């Protein structure tokens, strides 16, 4: 017999449904549920007296007959594909189905079969997102991995060998020997990884050697000499071997200006790191290249968003990261040339327009590895407060803005680096690298993180208590982060050439190797919800930035959400 219940009661039991609105953390960002794939009156929920019981919501279907390994019930999915409610079925470490879960023998419309072999994760009242992808990592310290994972990042790509001075400044792992040692080390952590080799060379042989040795991308960094010759050589090798090239251009304009770099690139695909310039690049106008169709522009998180503290902290940060000396006037001038309030303010707006497409960390080298997700949403909130609703919004909500910003650390870096067939969104067939969030803690502290469908960390209380919720509750590693589960739950991304050469066997790696693909010939048009191509001009004297003739400026934030109130203990 059908019955009606108040929306508040329904949301308390089964989570919000179509038309309901949810605030993200303590921001001004409000999302609205666009659609609901569950069926009213046939929702599944686990617990005493609830639906997922033998003969009710749980069928007799075996795993061999198609029952799921795990079902996440009534989750509010926040993804570039939309903001909607659904059950999510996981099988063999991948997203098998998105829709309606239950027992097809007793319920209508079931496309996710729950059987005796199915585990249940309660998604009602929770937000489900794809795991984050940080594509700008300096592998300085292995402890970064914990900070990233517990913030909701499940894939890290970058370079380095530890706290060597080359790594403190540049995201490059130089040479196949170092690449091999790093892949062997990263085999042990519950995280997906990719290694970027050093791309600074004017002849191709050494670059080919690194790509065949396991690098899945190449990095051009000014501290190693990002000359027009090195740029051209690296891109030529990348085009031949299908890996991405990331670039940190010449701040001092020694080997040329931004126009010379653009000429050396010759319209080829390139991922431009910290395209605003505070993290490094042609001063003062590297930001112009975010309007080029072949450039995939990203930010690093210290300038996200522009606040009253941004400029002051950057000078000391830069001196340390690039091995500079405050007693040398030229070093101080170098540092000061990179830090410009006008371009940092413009960067906020260019992100909101969708002209900057990716956000990453620059871990321990002018970036905070555990704050990619927080700072993305702080930027979105600041822009909502300062610019109001986006013109693209179709309702009284921030769905379009939220979809645009989540794409910046999920699908877009995955597209840029040739791994979007594996990660970056909640879509059938992709790896079940997922984050479950309490809406009040969205973007700050994930409730649970899964790698290939296995829980690797979660909020957990006192483990000597009689129940799992007593204080202190904090994020702790779970079973998926231990033993041989690690090698089954995470992968290493390598070049196609390295996989064909069986480097996994040569190096004794136990994680699966996945070849990157489709990194060349793509452009800004391929970056989802972040494909704007404004014509950018920078005044060389005042550093004012204009997009299609319009001055881009905004005030620095004095207070941010998702900050101190979440980190009192």
Curated annotation (Swiss-Prot):
Binding site for Ni(2+) 2: 219, 248, 274
Pathway(s) the chain acts in: Nitrogen metabolism; urea degradation; CO(2) and NH(3) from urea (urease route): step 1/1
Cofactor note: Binds 2 nickel ions per subunit.
InterPro entries membership: Amidohydro-rel, Metal-dep_hydrolase_composite, Metal_Hydrolase, Urease_alpha_N_dom, Urease_alpha_subunit, Urease_AS, Urease_asu, Urease_asu_c
PTM statement from Swiss-Prot or TrEMBL: Carboxylation allows a single lysine to coordinate two nickel ions.
PANTHER family: UREASE
Entry similarity comment: Belongs to the metallo-dependent hydrolases superfamily. Urease alpha subunit family.
Protein name: Urease subunit alpha
Lineage: Bacteria, Pseudomonadati, Pseudomonadota, Alphaproteobacteria, Rhodobacterales
Encoding gene, per UniProt annotation: ureC
